[in-house]
């Protein structure tokens, strides 16, 4: 392929790290011996960067073996913006070891070692890893490959690894990488297996992209919700409850504002609210399928010699609530909303602040409808999601449509109807979307909504999921116009996703400086001296009467110190400076977060202004 690319242009040959031959990825060393459609993969393209990242994982493994030859290498996939590789070392790696490994990687890059692919029969591959390489992990991987299949390897100098490819032509292509951290990881993610060491790294096609990403990561570190959550007194985490965050009074204000807003907007949109039990009998989870497919993530308990499970999802309870009463087609659509607390067991190593927890509140809604109502209901949900994401928070977002997977329940006809309804709703609204072929759940297609935060990261939050499974399992019906029983179409949807996770995203998006309507403390009243305190307290009383969340700082500290604390530490949206002039003129001196400018308003004018500033506005 290299010679073909070179025949077109030298620059194409230099920039290509692979090619597609009739849609199949191949290395640049591939010899084309038949007529085919060929497309070269540019190193700077998303697919090209994935090839670079894959090859950088191999580069790191080679460097590790040069430095620590008794280490066993296991697997090393590509992840977003980089890669990782799991190792079984004789002694645990430290952060200092990462510097040595990275330096060795750079030496190997300078050697510009060629990557060569070859294949062995499955049994010979097992023999190689068992007898020559003496690597039980690779033996296990190869044993999972069907009998009779060929197993592909890549060799780069003194290093050989099991791999399907595709890879860069030589190590000289790998010039922009940075090792990030080392962490524990169980072999194949199973806690019954040995704990390995996972080294994470970033990798890009060029140094400029790497530097840009590292700058973003530096900014992300400043915005870390765990750090800001502690500084802003929003929440804390305790060793007595890993994965179970404690919300403090200020954090509860943020949480309750989001929840109250959610409830009001759903009531306006025609939703009825539910509350279903947090713990339900094992039999229910057997009917829903969770007991067989999700058992290891569920918390259980025995009551009166019966086995119960704390709910990991709200859906079965929502189905029971709908099924509890007889429904006519005239009652549909039935929009049932629930802010339900769910519990899911996550491995301790996967827990991350509010982003990955064991207990969280999901803003679920389940809509039961007739087939001819599906598209209109989807349009209604998309508009509601847009109202929150775009008009309230000002988020840009992307939509992905995931279609029927190979293994699925339901007829092709109902899948076609459901996918057409999802796509048709988006087309009708003029929304762009990406299709993920075969990535839907086995029980129905879905739309995923991914919001973009202030530093360009994408977060999957909202989902619209059609479900053919639960109505069938629970035998859910309604009485149609013909007087007969019919199966309703069920739709699951979330907007926030998890309240806790969404708060974590907002903390990082706003870097802790919430918009005024959401801030735990909206106004801080700062006095210059003791003579101003009575006037400041009058203002505080009026703000409380107006429903404004305000605090008074009448400590015997300098005004500069008070401003730095209110502005820099607590990120209060509005600060009022009260001195002699303000008392005499019946006015306030206003300073907004992040600004050094100050301006004055008479009291009556200020009260109108502050109420308007603190009002929730869907107008972004």
From Swiss-Prot:
It catalyses: tRNA(Thr) + L-threonine + ATP = L-threonyl-tRNA(Thr) + AMP + diphosphate + H(+). Residues 1-42 form the TGS domain. GO terms for molecular function: ATP binding; metal ion binding; threonine-tRNA ligase activity; tRNA binding. Keywords: Aminoacyl-tRNA synthetase, ATP-binding, Cytoplasm, Ligase, Metal-binding, Nucleotide-binding, Protein biosynthesis, RNA-binding, tRNA-binding, Zinc. Coiled coil: none annotated. Binds 1 zinc ion per subunit. Zn(2+) binds at residues 315, 366, 492. GO terms for biological process: threonyl-tRNA aminoacylation. GO terms for cellular component: cytoplasm. InterPro entries: aa-tRNA-synt_IIb, aa-tRNA-synth_II, aa-tRNA-synth_II/BPL/LPL, Anticodon-bd, Anticodon-bd_dom_sf, Beta-grasp_dom_sf, TGS, TGS-like. Residues 224-515 are annotated as: Catalytic. CDD domains: TGS_ThrRS, ThrRS_anticodon, ThrRS_core. It is found in: Cytoplasm. Gene3D superfamilies: 3.10.20.30, 3.30.54.20, Anticodon-binding domain (3.40.50.800), Bira Bifunctional Protein, Domain 2 (3.30.930.10), Threonyl-trna Synthetase, Chain A, domain 2 (3.30.980.10). Homodimer. This is Threonine--tRNA ligase. It comes from Fusobacterium nucleatum subsp. nucleatum (strain ATCC 25586 / DSM 15643 / BCRC 10681 / CIP 101130 / JCM 8532 / KCTC 2640 / LMG 13131 / VPI 4355).
């Amino acid at each position: 392929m290299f010679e073909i690319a070179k025949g077109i242009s030298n620059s194409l040959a230099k920039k290509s790290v692979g090619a597609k031959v009739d849609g199949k990825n191949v290395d640049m060393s591939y010899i084309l011996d038949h007529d085919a459609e060929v497309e070269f993969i540019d190193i700077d393209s998303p697919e090209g960067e994935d090839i670079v990242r894959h090859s950088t994982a191999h580069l790191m493994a080679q460097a590790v073996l040069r430095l620590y030859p008794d280490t066993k290498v296991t697997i090393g996939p590509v992840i977003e913006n980089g890669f990782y590789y799991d190792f079984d070392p004789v002694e645990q790696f430290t952060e200092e070891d990462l510097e040595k490994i990275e330096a060795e990687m750079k030496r190997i890059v300078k050697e510009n070692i060629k990557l060569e692919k070859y294949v062995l029969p499955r049994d010979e591959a097992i023999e190689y890893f068992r007898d020559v390489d003496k690597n039980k992990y690779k033996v296990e991987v190869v044993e999972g490959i069907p009998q009779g299949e060929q197993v592909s390897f890549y060799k780069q100098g003194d290093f050989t690894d099991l791999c399907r490819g595709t890879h860069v032509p030589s190590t000289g292509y790998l010039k922009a990488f940075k090792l990030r951290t080392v962490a524990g990881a169980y072999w194949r993610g199973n806690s019954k297996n040995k704990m390995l060491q996972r080294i994470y790294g970033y990798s890009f096609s060029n140094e400029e992209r790497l530097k840009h990403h590292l700058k973003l990561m530096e900014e992300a570190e400043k915005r870390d919700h765990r750090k800001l959550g502690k500084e802003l007194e929003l929440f804390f985490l305790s060793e007595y409850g890993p994965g179970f965050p404690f919300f403090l009074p200020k954090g509860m204000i943020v949480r309750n504002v989001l929840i109250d807003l959610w409830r009001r907007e759903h009531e306006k949109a025609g939703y009825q609210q539910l509350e279903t039990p947090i713990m339900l009998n094992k039999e229910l989870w057997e009917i829903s399928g969770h007991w067989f497919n999700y058992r290891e993530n569920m918390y259980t308990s025995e009551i009166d010699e019966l086995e119960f499970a704390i709910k990991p999802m709200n859906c079965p309870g929502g189905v029971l609530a709908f099924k509890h009463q007889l429904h006519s087609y005239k009652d549909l659509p039935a929009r049932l909303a629930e802010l339900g607390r769910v519990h899911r067991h996550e491995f301790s190593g996967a827990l991350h602040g509010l982003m990955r927890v064991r207990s969280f509140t999901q803003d679920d809604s389940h809509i039961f409808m007739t087939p001819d109502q599906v598209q209109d209901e989807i349009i209604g949900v998309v508009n509601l999601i847009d109202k929150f994401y775009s008009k309230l928070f000002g988020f840009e977002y992307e939509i992905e449509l995931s279609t029927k997977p190979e293994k699925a329940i339901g007829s092709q006809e109902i899948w076609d109807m459901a996918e057409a309804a999802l796509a048709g709703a988006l087309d009708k609204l003029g929304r762009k979307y990406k299709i993920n072929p075969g990535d839907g759940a086995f029980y129905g297609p879905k739309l995923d909504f991914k919001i973009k935060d202030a530093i360009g990261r994408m977060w999957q939050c909202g989902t619209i999921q059609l479900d053919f499974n639960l109505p069938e399992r629970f035998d859910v019906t309604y009485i149609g116009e013909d007087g007969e029983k019919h199966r309703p179409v069920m739709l699951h949807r979330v907007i926030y996703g998890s309240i806790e996770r969404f708060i974590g995203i907002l903390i990082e998006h706003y870097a802790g400086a919430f918009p005024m309507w959401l801030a735990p403390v909206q106004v801080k009243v700062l006095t210059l001296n003791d003579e101003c305190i009575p006037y400041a307290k009058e203002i505080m009383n009026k703000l409380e009467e107006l429903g404004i969340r305000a605090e008074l700082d009448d400590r015997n500290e300098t005004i500069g110190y008070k401003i730095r604390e209110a502005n820099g530490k607590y990120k209060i949206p509005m600060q009022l400076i009260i001195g002699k002039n303000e008392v005499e003129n019946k006015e306030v001196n206003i300073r907004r977060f992040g600004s050094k400018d100050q301006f004055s308003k008479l009291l009556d004018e200020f009260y109108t202004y502050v109420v308007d500033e603190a009002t929730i506005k869907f107008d972004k």
